[in-house]
Structures are given as C-alpha cells and as structure tokens.
Amino acid sequence: MAYTRAEDVQIDAWEQIGNEGWTWKSLLPYYEKSQNLTVPTTVQVAAGASYDSSVYGEEGPQHVGFLKMEPSNFTTTLNRTFQNTGVPWTEDVNTGKMRGWNIFPSTINYAEYVREDAARAYYWPYQSRKNLHVLMNTNANRLIWKSQSGDEATAEGVEITSANGTVSTVHAKNEVIISAGALKSPALLELSGVGNPRYVHPLSSIILH
C-alpha cells in the first residue's frame, strides 16, 4: 500500500551491469505516466504530508495519495526523535533520494477512499478489450526459447500449468514480458536456464551461457 521508489543509484546500477538505457532518469517519465496523484490537502500538509510535484504524474491509471491525517504534534515529536538518532527529514522519498524519514503517499483512491491495486488500475477499466485475455489460477513454469545461445537468446513463449493440471505453451507474437515481482521474476528465469549455473543446473535442463 505504501508508494515508494528505489534509490536512483540502485536503478542506475542496472545500466552499469549491462542493461543499457535503464537509469533513474529514463525510468522516471514512466513512473509519472502511471500515476494519478491526489495532491495533499492543506490539512494533510499541516499534519506532515509533503511531496515534490516534479516527480509525480496526475493523469495515469494508478491512484496515489495520502491517508487521512489530522494536525498534531506527532510529526514534530517524530522528527525530533529521528534527528537525535542521525536520521534526517527528507521532503519526498520518491525523488530517488530515500535516506531519511518522511510521511510518504500510499496507493489509494482518495476520492473513494479504497485501496488502489493492479486490478483497479490496469485490469477492470480494460477487461472488455478483445485483445486482452487473462488466465486465472495459472502457473508459469518456464520460458520457451527461440535460441539457446546466451548472446542471442530470445523468448518465444511460456510453458504454463492450468488450474486442472494441464501443461501447455502460450506463444508470443511479439515479445514475452516477465512481471512476476522481485522474488518470482528471478525464480522463473532460473527455472528457464538463466542465472548462476550453481543454482540453475539442478532446476533446468537448459542452461543459457
């Protein structure tokens, strides 16, 4: 529910290890494009909410806003406590500089006061599209490769297991996008032969070099 981004140096590290063009600067416009920020009210600001408008979007599908807040001495006390332990105040943790403490926004539709999630933002508004098919209760087993050469490896499909246990392959017309989270994305790659051979070898009969 908390809406926070990584440090800019963490994202820039992806380019440094070989993913050309993957930087904080190049990714920021897509962060902004995805957002629909509800600007904090004067009451929320008085209670400690703060943000940098230059790093937010207000026309995207995902609602982001601040929880209901009432002015009190809570943030003053909290700030004093953190300052005494060497933790500085930062205006906004979503600028690429996370070090410090801050009253950060949440993935929330403030107008309806409900939690915002991927279904509300990206699925429900588009579920009637003819070119969108969602497979429920389906597990992705591994990627199917067009070539097994590490330098030219291109995924052309995904092997899946459906709810009834049937194993089949979904073929891609253009590209395969892995979006399984910070834990499952690397796990799926390892099951597909991509990663440290020490871990990949026991998991996959195909190892890409």
Which residues does each predicted region cover?
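Structural core of flavin- and non-heme-iron oxidoreductases
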Residues: 1-209
